[in-house]
Amino acid sequence: MFGFLNVYKPVGKTSHDVVAFLRRVTKIKQIGHTGTLDPFAEGVLPICIGKATRLIEYLEDDKAYIGTFCFGKSTDSFDIDGNIVETFEDKVAEDDIQSALKSFEGVIEQMPPIYSAIKIDGKKLYEYAREGKTVDINPRKVTIEKIELRSFDYENQIAEIYIKCSKGTYIRSIANDLGKALNN
């Protein structure tokens, strides 16, 4: 058996959890996904089965996300699961978000989060982070084809942002960088 399958990945599961479940249920060992979704993210996880896994490296199409960004605090992992490293009293305005988003369109340099599966010297970054070790991380070029504010709750400082981007883009890094651009 071979082919492609779009699977809904719920919050709280890793992309690997989904693959492991499918391997167990189908009794097929050759199963892989086309890109990792963070455990706190939910959405469609494209799966390749059997000989289709050989095509994963050729699936370079853009990806689209809707992210929920919370202003007023910064975490070490750039997401809600991380430890808060800084808080901000001032609220951001919707117009300021709209203006700042324009600087993210096109080819940008993005610093991956320390809590990520990117490997340096054969070891995943999150392994270094959990050990409390610092490593030099190089920024990566990514393309943001479209980024737009869908909604904004001023009182709670929560924005819903649509992003169409190249493979390898970290939405968490965009959230962190947007916060920095807004001094928040």
Residue ranges and their predicted role:
Residues 1-184:
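Catalytic/RNA-binding core of pseudouridine synthases
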